[in-house]
Amino acid sequence: MLKLENLTYRYEHLMMRFDLHIQAGERIAILGPSGAGKSTLLNLIAGFQTAEKGSLWLNGENHTSTSPAQRPVSMLFQENNLFSHLTIEQNIGLGLHPGLRLNSTQKQTLQQIVSQVSLEDCLPRLPAQLSGGQRQRAALARCLVRQQPILLLDEPFSALDPALRNEMLVLLEQVCHERQLTLLMVSHNLDDAARIADRALLIVDGNIHYDGLTNTLVAGTVPEAAILGMKTDAI
């Protein structure tokens, strides 16, 4: 489903290199210190940044040099990037057609996704008229209408209060299960990571320092947990 082989990218003085294999339907939490390369990893997969060397395979096809629009991925950021002058329906519709000229099938897809994220009553409203949680639901819906098999999340819920963050995690679990999505989520919240993903990557200085069970890392039973500021039981 997703394979990175010696994928290399230079950021200022830091040379980042990623080797990674992910099966279809896996959920991966991406952890690590600020500036370690977590967002860069997602941007390389999405095509927003270009690797100097190495290869990137998505869904069995080589996407090392393809444009973001050609890649089978959708990406959601911490900032929802909704257009303030467009209604929620129009914002979500942009995921289907940049000119908002939707055919009947696309309109049906939009309605199905909107129902799944419980935003039926919000469609005619502007983003400013919604709560923070509703805006993130709308941003997630815009990703989902594209119906891509790989979902990339870059700290999407960090600005939400605990109740809203929990609400979004419940929704995310449901969506990933129903659609069998492959998920990679950057997070600084260890509880969120353990809840949403069985497998975790710990990124340090542009390299994968740990690739294993999330619960093992969060429990502090491996020495790599010290990088996250945790006391470890490892000798």
Curated annotation (Swiss-Prot):
This enzyme's EC code(s): 7.6.2.15
One annotated Gene Ontology cellular component of this protein: plasma membrane
Main EC class the enzyme belongs to: translocase
Subcellular location: Cell inner membrane
Pfam families: ABC_tran
GO molecular function, one term: ATP binding
Binding positions for ATP per the UniProt entry: 32-39
The ABC transporter domain, residue ranges: 2-230
Keywords: ATP-binding, Cell inner membrane, Cell membrane, Membrane, Nucleotide-binding, Translocase, Transport
Subcellular location, principal: membrane
Record keyword Translocase present: yes
Catalysed reactions, as listed in the record: thiamine(out) + ATP + H2O = thiamine(in) + ADP + phosphate + H(+)
Keyword Cell inner membrane: yes
Entry membrane topology: Peripheral membrane protein
Family recorded in the similarity comment: Belongs to the ABC transporter superfamily. Thiamine importer (TC 3.A.1.19.1) family.
Function noted in UniProt: Part of the ABC transporter complex ThiBPQ involved in thiamine import. Responsible for energy coupling to the transport system.
Assembly mode: The complex is composed of two ATP-binding proteins (ThiQ), two transmembrane proteins (ThiP) and a solute-binding protein (ThiB).
Listed NCBIfam families: PRK10771.1, thiQ
Protein name: Thiamine import ATP-binding protein ThiQ
Organism: Photorhabdus laumondii subsp. laumondii (strain DSM 15139 / CIP 105565 / TT01) (Photorhabdus luminescens subsp. laumondii)
Gene (name only): thiQ
